[in-house]
Swiss-Prot record:
GO terms for molecular function: 4 iron, 4 sulfur cluster binding; iron ion binding; NADH dehydrogenase (ubiquinone) activity; quinone binding. It comes from Barbarea verna (Land cress). NCBIfam families: ndhI, NuoI, PRK05888.1-3. Its cofactor is [4Fe-4S] cluster. PANTHER family: NAD(P)H-QUINONE OXIDOREDUCTASE SUBUNIT I, CHLOROPLASTIC (PTHR47275:SF1). NDH shuttles electrons from NAD(P)H:plastoquinone, via FMN and iron-sulfur (Fe-S) centers, to quinones in the photosynthetic chain and possibly in a chloroplast respiratory chain. The immediate electron acceptor for the enzyme in this species is believed to be plastoquinone. Couples the redox reaction to proton translocation, and thus conserves the redox energy in a proton gradient. This is NAD(P)H-quinone oxidoreductase subunit I, chloroplastic. Transmembrane segments: none annotated. Its EC number is 7.1.1.-. It catalyses: a plastoquinone + NADH + (n+1) H(+)(in) = a plastoquinol + NAD(+) + n H(+)(out); a plastoquinone + NADPH + (n+1) H(+)(in) = a plastoquinol + NADP(+) + n H(+)(out). Signal peptide: none annotated. It comes from the Eukaryota. GO terms for cellular component: chloroplast thylakoid membrane. It is an enzyme of class 7 (translocase).
Amino acid sequence: MLPMITGFMNYGQQTLRAARYIGQGFMITLSHTNRLPVTIQYPYEKLITSERFRGRIHFEFDKCIACEVCVRVCPIDLPVVDWKLETNIRKKRLLNYSIDFGICIFCGNCVEYCPTNCLSMTEEYEFSTYDRHELNYNQIALGRLPMSVIDDYTIRTILNSPQTING
C-alpha cells in the first residue's frame, strides 16, 4: 500500500510542476499582449533608422584627395576612383568616383577610414529598381542629399527664412 501512495504523491507533484510550467508560459504569452506592435506597414510607414544606420553613401567631391584608401579597405574593392596626376602642383586631381550599390555590402569601412571625411552614411535605404545598372551611382548621384535630410525641420527653416541684406 505504501508504494501505491508514494506513486500517487509523485504523480501529484509531477502534475503540479507541469501546471506551474504551463502557467508560466501562459503568463509570458499574456505579457506580450500589452506590448506595442513591431511590424510597420512599409509603403505607408517608414522605418525609423538609428543614429548608426548604414544606408546609402554620401560623397563630397570637393573634399576627396583621390588617395584610394576607400578602395584598399573595401572587402570587395568596390569604389571606382579615376584620377589624373597634375605634374605642375604634384597632386592628384579626381576625375570620377562611383560606387555600385548592387554589389556594395554596406560595411562602412570606406567611411570609417576616409582621411578627409568626404564619405558619410545616410539614412536612405530604398534602392528598388528594375535595372541593376541604375544602382551604379557616380559622383553626382552620390552627392545628392537624401530626402529625409532635405525635409529636416532645421533645413526647412533655413531655406524658408527671409534673407537680410546688410546695406
